[in-house]
Amino acid sequence: MEAADSATNNSKDTHFYGKSRAENRRRSDAMLLLFRALTFSFSLAAVVVMGTNRYRINPQLKVSWYDFEPYRYVLAVNAIICIYSFVETWLAVYTYLQGSYLLPEIFQVWFDYGHDQGFAYLLFSANSAGVAMAQLLQSGNTLIHGAYHCTEAGGYCTQARVSIALGFVAFLFLALSSLLTGLRVARWYLR
C-alpha cells in the first residue's frame, strides 16, 4: 500500500514549495495581469495630468505642456505606453481566463519580453528628459516664455512634476512586467 502511495505522489508534477506548474503559471499570469493593469492606469494618469497642464500667466499669455519639447516627449511616450499596456492587459486577461496564449507561445513570449524591454527604456528616457526640464524651470535657469519663473505660472511646474512621477511609477510596473516576461522566456528554453 505504501509503495502505491509513494508512486502516486512521485507521479505528481510538483514544483518548488509544493506548487504544481499549473498553479505557478496561474499565479504568474495573475501577477502579470496586475502589473499590466497598473502600468496602464499610471500611464493613463500621466497622460491626463500632462495633457491638462495649462495655466494663464497673465490675460494675454498662457503656458502649456506643448511649449517645452521634453514635456511633449513625456506625453507622447506615456500615450504610447498607455496604448501598449492596454493591449497587453487585454492579452493578459485572455491568458489568465483561457489558460493559454492567444498567439503561438514562442512568438508571444518573445513579443512580450522584447516590447516590455524596449518600452521600459523609452519610458525611462522620456521621464528623465522631463525631470531635467522640470529642474531647469524650477531653478530659474530656463524661464517660461523667456521671462517668467515657475512661481508666476500657478501650478504649472507642480503639475508637470506630478505627471513625470506618475510616469516613473508606470515605468516601475512595466519593469516588473518585463522581469516576469523575461522569466517566461527563460522557462520556455529550460523545458
From Swiss-Prot:
<feature type="transmembrane region" description="Helical">
    <location>
        <begin position="73"/>
        <end position="93"/>
    </location>
</feature>
<feature type="transmembrane region" description="Helical">
    <location>
        <begin position="117"/>
        <end position="137"/>
    </location>
</feature>
<keyword id="KW-0472">Membrane</keyword>
<feature type="topological domain" description="Extracellular">
    <location>
        <begin position="51"/>
        <end position="72"/>
    </location>
</feature>
<dbReference type="Pfam" id="PF04535">
    <property type="entry name" value="CASP_dom"/>
</dbReference>
<keyword id="KW-1003">Cell membrane</keyword>
<feature type="topological domain" description="Cytoplasmic">
    <location>
        <begin position="1"/>
        <end position="29"/>
    </location>
</feature>
<feature type="transmembrane region" description="Helical">
    <location>
        <begin position="162"/>
        <end position="182"/>
    </location>
</feature>
<dbReference type="GO" id="GO:0005886">
    <property type="term" value="C:plasma membrane"/>
</dbReference>
<protein>
    <recommendedName>
        <fullName>CASP-like protein 4C2</fullName>
    </recommendedName>
</protein>
<dbReference type="InterPro" id="IPR006702">
    <property type="entry name" value="CASP_dom"/>
</dbReference>
<feature type="transmembrane region" description="Helical">
    <location>
        <begin position="30"/>
        <end position="50"/>
    </location>
</feature>
<dbReference type="InterPro" id="IPR006459">
    <property type="entry name" value="CASP/CASPL"/>
</dbReference>
<comment type="similarity">
    <text>Belongs to the Casparian strip membrane proteins (CASP) family.</text>
</comment>
<keyword id="KW-0812">Transmembrane</keyword>
<keyword id="KW-1133">Transmembrane helix</keyword>
<comment type="subunit">
    <text>Homodimer and heterodimers.</text>
</comment>
<feature type="topological domain" description="Cytoplasmic">
    <location>
        <begin position="94"/>
        <end position="116"/>
    </location>
</feature>
<feature type="topological domain" description="Cytoplasmic">
    <location>
        <begin position="183"/>
        <end position="191"/>
    </location>
</feature>
<feature type="topological domain" description="Extracellular">
    <location>
        <begin position="138"/>
        <end position="161"/>
    </location>
</feature>
